[in-house]
Structures are given as structure tokens and as C-alpha cells.
């Protein structure tokens, strides 16, 4: 869970920007999107092998 405290004399936009940066660095959004729907193990393996193939070329 990402937590951002608004500092003294800090605008809301700056605090929001810091919060978005911490969320993206922690990978929270990506993880939640990945777990949104159930994915069969066979589909996971297929995606993993396709990603490895893309990295190879």
C-alpha cells in the first residue's frame, strides 16, 4: 500500500505526482490489472513463452 503525506506548503498536484510515482514504482497498478481476471495456467505459460520469444529477438 502506497502512502503519501502532503507536506507543508505543498500543492495538491505535487503530492498527487509523488503518489503516482510511488504507485508506479511499487508496481501496484500492474499487479492489480494482472489479477483482475482469472487466467488459466496454460494461458500463463503461453504468454510467458511468447514474452521470452519477443525478448530473444
Swiss-Prot record:
In which residue ranges is the amino acid composition biased (Basic residues)? 43-57
In the record, what terms sit under GO molecular function?
structural constituent of ribosome
Keywords of this entry: Ribonucleoprotein, Ribosomal protein
Superkingdom: Bacteria
HAMAP family xref list: Ribosomal_bS21
Which biological process annotations from GO are given for this protein? translation
Gene Ontology CC, one term:
ribosome
Family label: Belongs to the bacterial ribosomal protein bS21 family.
User: Per the record, which residues fall in region Disordered?
Assistant: 24-57
| Coiled coil ranges | none
Enumerate composition-biased segments (Basic and acidic residues).
31-42
What protein name is recorded for this chain? Answer: Small ribosomal subunit protein bS21
Q: Which InterPro entries match?
A: Ribosomal_bS21, Ribosomal_bS21_CS, Ribosomal_bS21_sf
Amino acid at each position: 500500500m502506497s502512502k503519501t503525506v502532503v507536506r507543508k506548503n505543498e500543492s495538491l498536484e505535487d503530492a498527487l505526482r509523488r503518489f503516482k510515482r510511488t504507485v508506479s514504482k511499487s508496481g501496484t497498478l500492474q499487479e492489480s490489472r494482472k489479477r483482475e481476471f482469472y487466467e488459466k495456467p496454460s494461458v500463463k505459460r503461453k504468454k510467458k513463452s511468447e514474452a521470452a520469444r519477443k525478448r530473444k529477438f
